[in-house]
Design a protein with these regions (language model features):
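Pre-Walker A-like glycine/lysine-rich segment at the N-terminus of P-loop NTPase domains
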Residues: 1-54
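Short, flexible loop/turn elements at secondary-structure junctions
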Residues: 8, 41, 100-104, 113-115
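Electropositive, glycine-dotted interaction segments
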Residues: 107-210
Length: 210
């Protein structure tokens, strides 16, 4: 496990120009606007960068299928069979998560996936879990089942006429889950909140620069 944090150290001095601060509810959050990764050769710097880029591209594509066109510098983001550790003897889940601030919201999004073994291109990939929290309140959690939190927290971002159709939306969302598709970018976007999905997508496109 590796955590790349942009939270400034409590006693860090001299970086005020690069620290953003936002108050959400009664909590003040601080974050660095950028960071530099340095270290000796073969220390894992490229792995960190490519892991963040791979997470970003998978989320924006919305599924675990390979990209149709292969033209990016980071091959693993387009051919997911390159992601698993080549030293593994049995498949192990791959986990991605991110926490960020946008439009006055603290967003926590994560998913884990079974991608098979290294170079196993024909493996039946599947999403194992997926979770979205806004301001530390559960919006949805997907494991063996799909569970929703209190959607009143995002009332202003819900699709039109959601209240009139929410019973059917919940039922359809649970029955229509696709093992290879991220719920955030598919069912949640179409049946619950295209606005929230768009905010997350735009942040990944415009703010997560790797």
């Amino acid at each position: 496990e590796f955590v790349f944090s942009l939270i400034p150290a409590p006693k860090q001095k001299g970086l005020d120009y690069s620290v953003m601060e936002e108050v959400i509810g009664k909590t003040s959050y601080k974050g660095l606007c950028s960071a530099v990764i340095y270290g000796p050769n073969a220390s894992g710097k490229t792995n960190i960068i490519e892991a963040m880029d791979t997470f970003k591209t998978i989320v924006l594509r919305g599924h675990l299928r390979n990209a149709e066109n292969h033209h990016r510098y980071n091959a693993a983001s387009e051919m997911l069979e390159l992601i698993p550790n080549n030293a593994l003897k049995t498949p192990e889940p791959v986990h991605f998560s991110i926490q960020f601030l946008t439009q006055g919201m603290l967003v926590d999004y994560s998913f884990s996936a079974d991608l098979g073994m290294f170079l196993e291109a024909e493996y039946a990939r599947k999403i194992l879990s997926e979770t979205l929290l806004i301001n530390k309140e559960l919006i949805f959690s997907r494991n063996t089942d799909l569970v929703f939190g209190n959607l009143e927290r995002i009332q202003d971002l819900l699709v039109d006429a959601f209240e009139d159709n929410k019973t059917g939306a919940f039922a359809l969302a649970k029955s229509g889950l696709n093992a290879t598709e991220l719920f955030l970018m598919n069912g949640f976007r179409t049946m619950f909140s295209a606005k929230l999905t768009a905010l997350i997508s735009e942040w990944l496109k415009q703010k997560l620069m790797v």
